């Protein structure tokens, strides 16, 4: 509600809700025509003539009020206020009446005097209490994050969990197919890939666990939420991915250098590797070309699940889903290596292509796993989001726009300034810390604690509505330093530096 008061002759109005029409008070309404509308008296029901007169008088007053409203709506100043009120992006606060209000000056405690008794003596029309206006709806232009769900039923329905369950089912089918295919078609490459598919199921289970727990609500014990659980899951999945790459590379390297290294050393090194061992003995066991169909089907399934998981990971800003997506891509590449090994071994009997392909694939695997591990570790130790990150730029722009449109008790003719913005990642969620610079006021105007509370509440509402994964926002206020104060501080610093230089110079000569 906004109350506008001007020195008499004046029009006192009340704006309730956002609409062009106004509710004009019946008590002491003064308009430019000099007509004064008094509060209607109690209708005397005993005298029909008086009742009729009172009804006619009320009708006449209503017509006068409607005419006054129409006249006011034509006023350019009113239209400007109504347009600002309809913008949804402002806050109306109490206008300072004196320096001796019940408030605390920012940065120092000065002129702090209680004025509750003075406020009690003032008429209610002058007690313009601070408030924000709230509409029955909010506007959110950011994409909804399906991982930010609240109930167990919603967790089961969100896209991240669904695609992980699909990936788990695909891994089970691939593991069974490759296991029996390796036995039936005498393919050691398929059999080794089946063992790797089993490790993928462990990765999927870790992803399901971390995504489900990270979606829980913050509690008193965990006020920042459970987003870090997803980060830990991302670290575990990325570690498994990197270890698989090292294992494949190690086995391929052993197979590649086998002809120039004694057989006993190769056997010892090969036993240290993963089940992905593409040595000469394995290639010699590939005798049935039909095993290639299983490898080709695995490539198609894994590539599809990679693209689907990666798309959802980007939409939900989920590192653990992204790590799991790359795990699917690695599986398709290892299946490609198996396909090449089966085909070349059967058709042209070129064994070296398999080992070289294994080294290339292992390099891609280690790169993807290492990057995922680095991102997870940086997030766990609370590295801030970089300033060129799209998430940072979006929130920074939103804060500045909101501050520029803010109508408050600030009379410096320039808005609050954004001095510092810090964003921290917590799984799919974000935590923010704002430092706002309050400009110097004119005419001894003192900003109250109540104003800062309302500005804080307004900023939080705007940002959490526009950025769905912003779970917590802390706001700090600092006072702007004037030019003389800055020059004085700078002069003191220069003086101290000169003294230190002279002192060092004297000690050197001594």
UniProtKB/Swiss-Prot annotation:
Residues 130-141 have a biased composition (Basic residues). It is a multi-pass membrane protein. Its main location: mitochondrion. GO terms for cellular component: membrane; mitochondrial membrane; mitochondrion. Keywords: Ion transport, Iron, Iron storage, Iron transport, Membrane, Mitochondrion, Transit peptide, Transmembrane, Transmembrane helix, Transport. GO terms for molecular function: monoatomic cation transmembrane transporter activity. GO terms for biological process: intracellular iron ion homeostasis; iron ion transport. Residues 120-141 are annotated as: Disordered. It is found in: Mitochondrion membrane. InterPro entries: Cation_efflux, Cation_efflux_TMD_sf, CDF_Transporter. It comes from the Eukaryota. Pfam families: Cation_efflux. The chain crosses the membrane at residues 165-185, 194-214, 241-261, 286-306, 333-353, 356-376. Mitochondrial metal transporter involved in mitochondrial iron accumulation. Belongs to the cation diffusion facilitator (CDF) transporter (TC 2.A.4) family. SLC30A subfamily. Present with 6490 molecules/cell in log phase SD medium. NCBIfam families: CDF. This is Mitochondrial metal transporter 1. It comes from Saccharomyces cerevisiae (strain ATCC 204508 / S288c).
